Regions:
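Metallo-beta-lactamase
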Residues: 16, 20-105
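Active-site HxH/HxHxD metal-binding segment of metal-dependent hydrolases
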Residues: 1-11
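Basic, nucleic-acid-binding surfaces and adjacent catalytic neighborhoods in DNA/RNA-processing proteins
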Residues: 108
């Protein structure tokens, strides 16, 4: 059995879930660690497809269903209010320092 939660709910340990424009995808905020767990909506350097060396980039638009990159940026903007140090991604290298700066760049 799994417990259901909604984006915005506070989970054990103060963890928060943030909705994204990608259907079924959330970003988790771990406040004690000042870490975002971004799943598939953000990609780190070297991630396929593309394999660019940008520290952080948006997932390919085709992964978003009917949403666009603009929709994704808008859904992620509330994360800019957080004191992010690290961004963990499912694809590519994580951001282990200056996470907020990397997030600001990708959402600009």
């Amino acid at each position: 059995m799994t417990d259901a939660f909604a984006a915005g709910d506070e989970l054990p340990g103060g963890i928060r879930a943030f909705a994204t424009a990608r259907p079924g995808e959330v970003v988790y905020w771990l406040p004690r660690q000042r870490t975002l767990v971004a799943g598939d909506v953000l990609l780190g350097a070297g991630a396929k497809p593309g394999g660019t060396q940008e520290p952080l980039r948006l997932c390919p638009e085709r992964w978003l269903g009917k949403a666009t990159h603009d929709d994704l940026r808008e859904s992620l903007r509330p994360l800019l209010d957080l004191p992010v140090s690290r961004v963990l991604v499912s694809h590519g290298r994580p951001i282990l320092r200056a996470g907020k700066r990397a997030l600001e760049e990708v959402l600009s």
